[in-house]
């Protein structure tokens, strides 16, 4: 009976870290807009601030709470950068919504083909 040998190559932290870089808070802070990608969808304004709720972990976010609650289920109070996107959080750091990097900003794909919420920086 032949013996099957499986070799697993593990990447070092250095190699993985070089492929996904954590964006700086200062590079992402500012005015943003959220919108469901359907015709006539309301635009929700949100500001990603560079003032920490929890140092080096969660930063303040504020915006149109009614609009954000309707769109996301609850209005985010915080945010944090991730190597592959932006996480909007409540005040304790629990996830409200995750937006992955996309060609024209950041996107959150809703379940059951309900659409895609797009997060875009407001051009100043």
Curated annotation (Swiss-Prot):
UniProt keywords, alphabetically: Disulfide bond, Metalloenzyme inhibitor, Metalloprotease inhibitor, Periplasm, Protease inhibitor, Signal
One Pfam family, short name: Inh
Spell out the disulfide connections. Answer: 44-67
Provide any one GO MF term from the record.
Answer: metalloendopeptidase inhibitor activity
Name the GO cellular-component terms. periplasmic space
Broad class of the protein's primary localization: periplasm
Please state the span of the N-terminal signal peptide per the UniProt entry: 1-17
Keyword Metal-binding among UniProt keywords: no
User: Subcellular localization, per the record?
Assistant: Periplasm
The role this protein plays is: Inhibitor of the alkaline protease.
Family the UniProt entry places it in: Belongs to the protease inhibitor I38 family.
Put simply, this protein is called Alkaline proteinase inhibitor
Q: Which organism is it from?
A: Yersinia ruckeri
């Amino acid at each position: 009976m032949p013996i099957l040998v499986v070799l697993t190559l593990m990447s070092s932290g250095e190699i993985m870290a070089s492929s996904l870089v954590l964006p700086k808070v200062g590079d992402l802070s500012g005015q943003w807009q959220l919108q469901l990608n359907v015709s006539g969808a309301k635009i929700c304004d949100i500001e990603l601030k560079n003032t920490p709720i929890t140092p080096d972990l969660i930063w303040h976010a504020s915006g149109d709470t009614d609009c954000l609650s309707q769109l996301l289920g609850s209005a985010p109070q915080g945010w944090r950068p991730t190597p592959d996107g932006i996480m909007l959080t409540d005040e304790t750091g629990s996830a409200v919504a995750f937006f992955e990097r996309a060609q024209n900003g950041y996107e959150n794909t809703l379940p059951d083909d309900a659409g895609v919420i797009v997060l875009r920086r407001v051009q100043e």
